[in-house]
Curated annotation (Swiss-Prot):
Its EC number is 1.2.7.8. It is an enzyme of class 1 (oxidoreductase). This is Indolepyruvate oxidoreductase subunit IorB. One of its GO terms (molecular function) is indolepyruvate ferredoxin oxidoreductase activity. Keywords: Oxidoreductase. The lineage of its organism: Archaea, Methanobacteriati, Methanobacteriota, Archaeoglobi, Archaeoglobales. The keyword Nucleus does not apply. Catalyzes the ferredoxin-dependent oxidative decarboxylation of arylpyruvates. The gene is iorB. It catalyses: indole-3-pyruvate + 2 oxidized [2Fe-2S]-[ferredoxin] + CoA = (indol-3-yl)acetyl-CoA + 2 reduced [2Fe-2S]-[ferredoxin] + CO2 + H(+). The keyword Thylakoid does not apply. Heterodimer of the IorA and IorB subunits.
């Protein structure tokens, strides 16, 4: 068994937290996990790319075209890292944009959401656009957007470990005052996925 997940977003969205939760959950289930952050991160707003490889793997980097799943916390970042997609990749795409300074300054143009989705669907039909940030706000904080998307992953994809392992990972890694909020966000994301909306067409 081998599962390749690439998590992309911008600094401050919790891409590293997302990958860390998934990795810890997989390890709790007794699975081999290798992770790699392959793009400069530190500053808020910079592009972030994290690879999570689970199962029969040694090398930390997912090869181009080798992702089984892409979690895109920001729409344009999904396009930036589309080289990892193939015709079977599941893409969970948070639709809330974070406009980069270059666009604000007028030196670059941010693509329309429909354009982004259309380009991704040229590679894989399995693109699921969802405003995960809105769901997170309903759970209590937009900062839980990444956890909403993890919940959706378990609703849409047959994962090799249970969502209860994710709950354990959240309890272990997050500050006690935000655990309940994040568990709620996880459940809301999962329920959103299993309800069949939005469709994965």
């Amino acid at each position: 068994m081998r599962l390749n997940i690439v998590v992309v977003g911008v600094g401050g969205q919790g891409a590293l937290t997302t990958s860390g939760i998934i990795a810890r959950a997989a390890m709790r289930a007794g699975l081999n996990v290798v992770t790699a952050e392959t793009h400069g991160m530190a500053q808020r707003g910079g592009s972030v790319e994290v690879h999570v490889r689970i199962g029969d793997v040694r090398a930390p980097l997912i090869p181009e075209g080798g992702a089984d799943v892409m979690i895109a916390l920001e729409p344009a970042e999904a396009l930036r890292y589309a080289k990892f997609l193939n015709k079977n990749t599941l893409v969970i795409l948070n639709t809330r944009k974070i406009i980069p300074p270059s666009v604000t300054a007028g030196t670059a143009k941010y693509p329309e959401l429909d354009e982004i989705i259309g380009e991704l669907r040229k590679v894989t039909p399995r693109v699921i656009p969802v405003n995960a940030s809105e769901i997170a706000e309903k759970a209590g904080s937009v900062l839980a957007t990444n956890v909403v998307v993890v919940g959706m992953l378990f609703g849409y994809y047959s994962m090799p470990f249970g969502i209860e392992h994710v709950e354990e990972a959240i309890r272990e890694t997050m500050k006690s005052k935000i655990v309940d909020l994040n568990l709620k966000a996880l459940k809301m994301g999962y329920n959103q996925a299993i309800s069949g909306r939005p469709s994965a067409v």
